[in-house]
Swiss-Prot record:
This is Large ribosomal subunit protein bL9. Belongs to the bacterial ribosomal protein bL9 family. One of its GO terms (biological process) is translation. The keyword Signal does not apply. The gene is rplI. NCBIfam families: L9. HAMAP family: Ribosomal_bL9 (MF_00503). It comes from Ureaplasma urealyticum serovar 10 (strain ATCC 33699 / Western). GO terms for cellular component: ribonucleoprotein complex; ribosome.
Amino acid sequence: MKVILLEDIANLGKKNDIVDVSDGYAKNFLIRQKKAVALTSKSQEVLNKDLAILQAQEQQAILDATLLKDELEQKPLHFFLKTNNLQTFGSISNKQIIDEINKDQKLVIKHMITKPHALGIGEHIVEISLHKKVIAKVNVIVSKE
């Protein structure tokens, strides 16, 4: 029996996949637990509409992330650290970089910095994952206060 999965199921498939399973497994477990629906022409149409909506949302998310990437890469972020001769006190963390970006942006970016974890004095390139397919390389300048 062919069914459309309504959620991810280990060793079977992911949400919206069409899989072929035994009749008993489909009727007694998957359909009864509302983890799948039987494949019919109507359920196929609903699946196609849902997939089209998901694809449009994904394309819009990529477009938004690309626009944000272009904006972030144009202007560097400036930070200042206290120093005593050659010794610096502290470093710039991921949270400080995210907070600085969120001041200027309408979007809220959380935990997207891929590297590095702490920055000292100097000029650094920080990669920020805005989407699975879009990574912005932001110039971060850390100066003495």
